[in-house]
Regions:
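Internal, hydrophobic beta-strand segments that form the core of beta-sheet-rich folds
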Residues: 124-150
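C-terminal region of N-terminal signal peptides and the immediate post-cleavage residues
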Residues: 3, 7-10, 19-38
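Edge beta-strand at a domain terminus
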Residues: 142-172
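Tryptophan-anchored aromatic micro-motifs
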Residues: 31-56, 85, 141-145
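A short, structured loop/turn motif at beta-sheet edges
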Residues: 30-36, 69-76, 98-104, 131-141, ...
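Flexible, membrane-facing loop/turn or short amphipathic-helix motifs
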Residues: 46-56, 114-121, 148-158
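Predominantly extracellular/secreted and cell-surface proteins with exposed
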Residues: 56-128
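One face of beta-strands
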Residues: 37-41, 62-68, 109, 139-145, ...
Length: 172
């Protein structure tokens, strides 16, 4: 094969790959980078797994409605929870934001984990959490809330499924 043919074949292959990537669903992910309006968030604590003893402690699923507003004005798309509920302890951050990474909404935070001990005591263990939610059909986002509890009685990991479902407006 001549040198010109090889160059043409490589160029054609690169162009085809570029078109395939450009037309792939991931290329349309930018369209999914808006997370606005009211959503029902479900943290499936009753389905949690992990290496921490906290993963084996029984809990119920936690559900709450939140309203989100997205902005891409800084070149990075961010969605913010409007008027978030009060933090359950003083160690939790008040502002809640997720950043769009091209395929998922991601939130990372340093926090403390409320580790229940015998006798009704609670130990506040240092932890790092990351939540990653992927847009799916009908505007539903699904993902995992992953926490690494760095030290203390609950040291280890906890993973729980999380979902965000759009709240439909009432039908009149």
């Amino acid at each position: 094969m001549s040198g010109h043919r090889k160059i043409a074949l490589v160029a054609l292959g690169a162009a085809s790959l570029g078109c395939a990537v450009w037309l792939s669903p991931a290329a349309f992910a930018g369209q999914a980078s808006s997370w606005d309006g009211p959503y029902l968030l479900t943290f499936a604590a009753n389905q949690k797994t992990g290496t921490s003893m906290a993963a084996r402690q029984p809990e119920t699923a936690q559900r709450a409605s939140y309203s989100f507003t997205s902005s891409c004005s800084t070149g990075v798309c961010v969605t913010t929870v409007n008027d978030p509920p009060a933090a359950k302890n003083q160690y939790m951050q008040r502002s809640v934001q997720y950043a769009w990474n091209g395929s998922q909404w991601v939130q990372q935070m340093n926090r403390t984990w409320d580790c229940p001990l015998l006798g009704g005591l609670v130990e506040h263990d240092p932890a790092r959490s990351i939540t990653a939610l992927t847009p799916g059909p009908n505007g539903v986002l699904t993902g995992v809330f992953h926490t690494e509890i760095v030290s203390g009685a609950c040291k280890g990991t906890v993973d729980m499924p999380v979902s965000a479902t759009p709240v439909s407006p009432p039908i009149i």
